[in-house]
Amino acid sequence: MSNPIYLALDLPRLDAAVALAQKVKGHVGGLKLGLEFFCAHGHHGVHEVAKVGLPIFLDLKLHDIPNTVAGAMQSIHVLEPAIVTIHAGGGRAMMEDAKAAAGEHTKVVAVTVLTSLDDADMSTMGVGGSAYDQAIRLADLAQEAGLDGIVCSGHEVGAIHKRWKNGFFVVPGLRPAEGKLGDQKRAVTPRAARDAGASVLVIGRPISRAEDPVAAARAIEATL
């Protein structure tokens, strides 16, 4: 992948999302559309953003019984996304069925532990061990289920890459060295994540909320 940056288009207005994508398309490798975008704009919105000409990452984080998730995967097949997310916490059978229902050219990756969660959150959720430990466990399960890869923070990607040499690793929650953390609790810089083995770097607010999004995207690209 020549440019691993996927811009998170988490904007409420479709026209604004398309305009931003057009502005920065020369400095990113793909576009990530999350649950908020998909619920607001549906298939039509995805088709409109796809006209920009970059790969589409549908970050829907599907999590339900195996049959329901498989049905959802079949429903979005027509959109031809490059990447789709499901939750590893849905279990092995759910992950296997999701992969079987996905399009031939769609990578199915499992979310391990959200980057907004830390060790204290693991404890309150009744999960034994740290966020790092849980991410490793769920990554192993995703590999056993035959998925293409996982979503994890930059803190875990290096260790998981060593256990899964040919895995596809998506790392969100990235912030430039001078950036604000916001609601991210386990953030690293884009360069650190890339050096640790990340395949895709998901970056949203540091670009989308910058005074000059093109300059921000170019600056991050230059660090890689």
Curated annotation (Swiss-Prot):
Record-linked Pfam families: OMPdecase (PF00215)
One CC-aspect GO term = cytosol
Annotated GO MF terms: orotidine-5'-phosphate decarboxylase activity
UniProt EC number: 4.1.1.23
Superkingdom to which the source organism belongs: Bacteria
Which reaction is catalysed here? orotidine 5'-phosphate + H(+) = UMP + CO2
Residues engaged in binding substrate: 10, 32, 59-68, 115, 175, 184, 204-205
**Active site: which residues?**
61
Main EC class of this protein? lyase
Provide the leader sequence positions.
Answer: none
Gene Ontology BP terms:
'de novo' pyrimidine nucleobase biosynthetic process; 'de novo' UMP biosynthetic process
Entry keyword set: Decarboxylase, Lyase, Pyrimidine biosynthesis
The pathway to which it is assigned is: Pyrimidine metabolism; UMP biosynthesis via de novo pathway; UMP from orotate: step 2/2
InterPro entries, per the entry:
Aldolase_TIM, OMPdecase, OMPdecase_AS, OMPdecase_bac, OMPdeCOase_dom, RibuloseP-bd_barrel
Q: Which SUPFAM superfamilies match?
A: Ribulose-phoshate binding barrel
NCBIfam families named among the record's database cross-references: PRK00230.1, pyrF
Family per similarity comment: Belongs to the OMP decarboxylase family. Type 1 subfamily.
Alphabetized HAMAP family for the sequence: OMPdecase_type1_B (MF_01200_B)
Quaternary structure and partners = Homodimer.
Q: What does this protein do?
A: Catalyzes the decarboxylation of orotidine 5'-monophosphate (OMP) to uridine 5'-monophosphate (UMP).
Protein name in UniProt? Orotidine 5'-phosphate decarboxylase
Originating organism: Novosphingobium aromaticivorans (strain ATCC 700278 / DSM 12444 / CCUG 56034 / CIP 105152 / NBRC 16084 / F199)
